[in-house]
Amino acid sequence: MTQVYNFSAGPAMLPVEVLRRAEQELRNWHGLGTSVMEISHRSKEFMQVAEESEKDLRDLLQIPANYKVLFCHGGARAQFAAVPLNLLGDSNSADYIDGGYWAHSAVKEAQKYCTPHVIDVTTHDNGLTGIQPMKQWKLSDNAAYVHYCPNETIDGVAINEQPDFGNKVVVADYSSAILSRPIDISRYGVIYAGAQKNIGPAGLTLVIVREDLLGKAHTALPSILDYKVLADNDSMFNTPPTFAWYLSGLVFKWLKEQGGLGEMEKRNQAKAELLYGAIDRTGFYRNQVAIANRSWMNVPFQMAEASLDKLFLSEAEAQGLQALKGHRVAGGMRASIYNAMPIEGVKALTDFMADFERRHG
């Protein structure tokens, strides 16, 4: 059987060790004779899953004690609404950094609840898209918070700086970059992330929120999106997505076994450098992102002859290189190389790219 490597942007590849363990435990979890999917979320057995997964996540990200960790429903799109409704308070304005598709999507949702001050930080130089340094961002004085997206999956644009905005409340959509490298949680008021890229399967959403920001929700906010309600109920205000939570917990343990986020950073940098090196080697492939803002997680690329895209994708699929088609908004190709993607998968892709260029270049 051909070795398959899944380059999907999300739901994305999971570590094979995690899948094997889940397979082994699927029908008889911890000797209970049932699956973890079938037990009560309030049982002592699942409470152990919840407690261990939070502890492991806190260890990985070095989350300070004055932050709550919430395991939620709804994906990042639910957080596009939850953030303003939890954080605006008496204000009607928030700063939104527009650096790409998902940042702009957050703006559109926020417009239902406030008047966002939208700050376009993109640059376009010699056909390459980049991001202004944070010190050039023109933040307003009275915004309730500053929202940005550190990694744009569609455009392959990353903001690698850590924010240093004084006392401003910083909110970040880390859906596609969480756990890929160490970050300083204390610089943020809220971090949220859909699980289906670098955490686990779809259905779970992670929120990390500083405690002093709780209790400010709009009165019309649905309870299921209220950070204080979720925190007071240990993320069990209603039945959580237990299987996704369990699998994410296994991923956290896998990350610790691999050496933590420092090791992930080294691996992810090596994978990205290998792939971008293959793209830049000749003019056959192109990436249109400024080098300083190239994503380690999502690598879009095009060919000089777009008519070859369909052939490239079909031949890649035949060789076990799956889900390389670019997003419908951007076209071309895109390789998502999250934590679970081994460097062997990236090497298989770059070898195929070189062979395809030799035959069609």
Curated annotation (Swiss-Prot):
Its main location: cytoplasm. It is found in: Cytoplasm. Its EC number is 2.6.1.52. The keyword Acetylation does not apply. Binds 1 pyridoxal phosphate per subunit. GO terms for cellular component: cytoplasm. Its cofactor is pyridoxal 5'-phosphate. L-glutamate binds at residue 42. Pathway: Amino-acid biosynthesis; L-serine biosynthesis; L-serine from 3-phospho-D-glycerate: step 2/3; Cofactor biosynthesis; pyridoxine 5'-phosphate biosynthesis; pyridoxine 5'-phosphate from D-erythrose 4-phosphate: step 3/5. The modification N6-(pyridoxal phosphate)lysine is found at residue 197. It catalyses: O-phospho-L-serine + 2-oxoglutarate = 3-phosphooxypyruvate + L-glutamate; 4-(phosphooxy)-L-threonine + 2-oxoglutarate = (R)-3-hydroxy-2-oxo-4-phosphooxybutanoate + L-glutamate. GO terms for biological process: L-serine biosynthetic process; pyridoxine biosynthetic process. One of its GO terms (molecular function) is pyridoxal phosphate binding. Keywords: Amino-acid biosynthesis, Aminotransferase, Cytoplasm, Pyridoxal phosphate, Pyridoxine biosynthesis, Serine biosynthesis, Transferase. It comes from the Bacteria. Pyridoxal 5'-phosphate binds at residues 76-77, 102, 153, 173, 196, 238-239. Gene3D superfamilies: Aspartate Aminotransferase, domain 1 (3.90.1150.10), Type I PLP-dependent aspartate aminotransferase-like (Major domain) (3.40.640.10). It is an enzyme of class 2 (transferase). It holds the Pfam family Aminotran_5. HAMAP family: SerC_aminotrans_5. Belongs to the class-V pyridoxal-phosphate-dependent aminotransferase family. SerC subfamily. Catalyzes the reversible conversion of 3-phosphohydroxypyruvate to phosphoserine and of 3-hydroxy-2-oxo-4-phosphonooxybutanoate to phosphohydroxythreonine. Homodimer. This is Phosphoserine aminotransferase. It comes from Yersinia pseudotuberculosis serotype IB (strain PB1/+). The gene is serC.
